[in-house]
């Protein structure tokens, strides 16, 4: 027979007897023998000559204080400019009260017949939460966005055998062979 789940099981009463508190207070029994009192603490030694005063320590002054965010999380822009020329060139920059800054210049550039693109270069800078100054300089053009900064991680050097293989491939480009899959 399969047991049936009962959501409201019935239990037999349990006889629990709780002792009633005594009307007379219980006092701890005195110790069987008294231990001797502890010896008095040693007296401090007072030097006969006054101690020399410690040398003053130089005050630590931070090189630059980093302002904290305002209560609403916004910073005041202390410098901002934007210039747009008729030839398509431009420049913009800004700086905020907490030290964030950015500057970019750009111009139209022919990247293909009847097709122009923008070539830009600039930087942005800020202070990381740990106090490290961060500055990224960049170029953005037909070769993509290329950023540089001292804080970027550096990968391991390319092994010499791979460098030789890359140099050989660059010196000996293969002519593209048309295959049936490449015909459109």
From Swiss-Prot:
**Residue ranges annotated for the Chitin-binding type R&R domain, each copy included:** 87-156
Residues carrying sugar: 24, 29, 33
Q: Does the keyword Signal apply?
A: no
Mention one GO molecular function: structural constituent of chitin-based larval cuticle
| Pyrrolidone carboxylic acid: modified positions | 1
User: Which keywords annotate this record?
Assistant: Cuticle, Glycoprotein, Pyrrolidone carboxylic acid
Cellular component annotations (GO), alphabetically ordered: chitin-based extracellular matrix
**Where is this chain compositionally biased, Pro residues type?**
27-59
| Residue segments, region Disordered | 1-66
What the protein does comes down to: Component of the abdominal endocuticle.
What name does the UniProt record give this protein?
Endocuticle structural glycoprotein SgAbd-1
Say which species the protein is native to.
Schistocerca gregaria (Desert locust)
